[in-house]
């Protein structure tokens, strides 16, 4: 079973989107584009807050090993 973590090898800022992409077996670039579109559609703040919260809640890949 997959575990959700912040990716160390597929990250741009904190690895949140990369970790989600690995968890769902999706392309990280596609998920990043979807996230940016969602952020624009919701005036950025909700997506930014969720991202920041996930940085602290979701463990890092190296913490999982």
UniProtKB/Swiss-Prot annotation:
Disulfide bonds: none annotated. It is found in: Cell membrane. It is a single-pass membrane protein. Pfam families: PspC. It comes from the Bacteria. GO terms for cellular component: plasma membrane. Keywords: Cell membrane, Membrane, Transmembrane, Transmembrane helix. The chain crosses the membrane at residues 37-57. Signal peptide: none annotated. Its main location: membrane. This is Uncharacterized membrane protein YvlC. It comes from Bacillus subtilis (strain 168). The lineage of its organism: Bacteria, Bacillati, Bacillota, Bacilli, Bacillales. The gene is yvlC.
């Amino acid at each position: 079973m997959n575990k959700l973590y912040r990716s160390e090898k597929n990250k741009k800022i904190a690895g949140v989107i990369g970790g989600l992409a690995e968890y769902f077996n999706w392309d990280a670039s596609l998920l990043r584009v979807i996230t940016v579109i969602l952020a624009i559609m919701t005036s950025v703040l909700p997506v930014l807050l969720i991202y920041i919260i996930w940085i602290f809640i979701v463990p890092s890949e190296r913490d999982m090993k």
